[in-house]
């Protein structure tokens, strides 16, 4: 796998969905919506930002919840095993202000993500994407310098990355996404995902 890079989504693949956990903490069901439910990321984020403002919730409120979260069971061991075999880059639509506690618990893997915009009191006023469709463009850029790319994710916002990669694999996606993209193989356990990655590396 020396000429391969594995690109992984973060939330739902290695860590819990941050917005779902925050929604449960503050008891606002609308904040439970994720890219597994709404395919348009801008629509989703503007909805989230509006709900935060309506309820007087700030970035520190979200960060407090994140500090109490751990990676998904088995995620750190899976990531360690994968990094022994090849290079791994996490491509995520999360934000730098959310990521640090989880990156520390995962052993500081390489992460490409986005940034939240806040005012002086921590109110979230907007967000800044690294670039539009950044996951797909990162895969294309890595391919252009001679790497074969294997990608794994679970949501609508991962599909373009999975289709662009030399091999794309779903990990624990909802049934709606499986039905919509039946050509993408599905894995449910980290052992399955690791095997699927190893098998893909032989064939690409």
Protein language model annotation of sequence segments:
Residues 2-115, 119-120:
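Alpha-helical substrate-recognition element adjacent to the catalytic core
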Residues 96-100, 158-159, 194:
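Short, well-ordered alpha-helical microsegments
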Residues 97-149, 180:
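Substrate-recognition "cap/lid" segment bordering the active-site pocket of phosphatases
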Residues 112, 184-193:
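Short acidic-hydrophobic, aromatic-tinged amphipathic segments that line or gate anion-handling sites
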């Amino acid at each position: 796998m020396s000429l391969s890079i594995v690109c992984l989504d973060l939330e739902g693949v290695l860590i819990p969905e941050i917005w779902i956990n925050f929604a449960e903490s503050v008891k606002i069901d609308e904040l439970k919506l994720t890219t597994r439910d709404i395919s348009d990321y801008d629509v989703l984020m503007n909805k989230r930002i509006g709900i935060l403002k309506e309820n007087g919730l700030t970035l520190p409120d979200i960060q407090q919840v994140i500090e109490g979260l751990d990676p998904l069971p088995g995620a750190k061991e899976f990531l360690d095993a994968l990094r022994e075999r090849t290079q791994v880059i996490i491509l995520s639509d999360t934000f730098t202000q959310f990521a640090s506690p989880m990156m520390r618990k995962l052993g500081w893997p390489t992460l490409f993500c986005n940034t939240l915009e806040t005012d002086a009191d921590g109110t979230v006023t907007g967000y800044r994407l690294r670039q539009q469709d950044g996951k797909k463009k990162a895969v294309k850029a890595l391919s252009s310098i001679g790497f074969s790319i294997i990608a794994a994710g679970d949501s609508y916002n991962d599909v373009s990355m999975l289709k662009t990669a030399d091999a794309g694999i779903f990990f624990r996606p909802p049934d709606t996404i499986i039905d919509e993209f039946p050509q993408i193989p599905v894995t449910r356990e980290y052992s399955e995902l690791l095997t699927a990655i190893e098998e893909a590396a032989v064939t690409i």
